Curated annotation (Swiss-Prot):
Descriptive protein name: MYB-like transcription factor TCL1
Domain Myb-like: 36-73
Molecular-function GO terms, alphabetical: DNA binding
Additional remarks: Plants over-expressing TCL1 does not have any trichomes on rosette leaves, inflorescence stems, cauline leaves or floral organs.
One Gene Ontology term, aspect cellular component: nucleus
GO biological process: fruit development; regulation of DNA-templated transcription; regulation of trichome morphogenesis
Free-text tissue specificity from the UniProt record: Expressed in inflorescences and trichomes of rosette and cauline leaves.
The species this protein was found in: Arabidopsis thaliana (Mouse-ear cress)
Disrupted gene: phenotype observed: Trichome formation on inflorescence stems and pedicels.
Keyword Zinc tagged: no
Keywords: Developmental protein, DNA-binding, Nucleus, Repressor, Transcription, Transcription regulation
PROSITE patterns membership: MYB_LIKE
Principal subcellular localisation of the protein: nucleus
Amino acid sequence: MDNTNRLRRLHCHKQPKFTHSSQEVSSMKWEFINMTEQEEDLIFRMYRLVGDRWDLIARRVVGREAKEIERYWIMRNCDYFSHK
């Protein structure tokens, strides 16, 4: 079993936590985020080093926010989004 599948299973079911005051998420926010190969590689390597500390990863990826990188990771690595 390769590391990608293992990581996918470990973190796929992690869902964002919602509070009572949270707003509805529009479909615009969940459109697939395009990353360059260099950004993808950097995100994957940083994830292996620091885990899901998106703020640390975002500091290394120029022009990307932590929320954007987290959404990209969830959409890229969860089975639900891979079938769409």
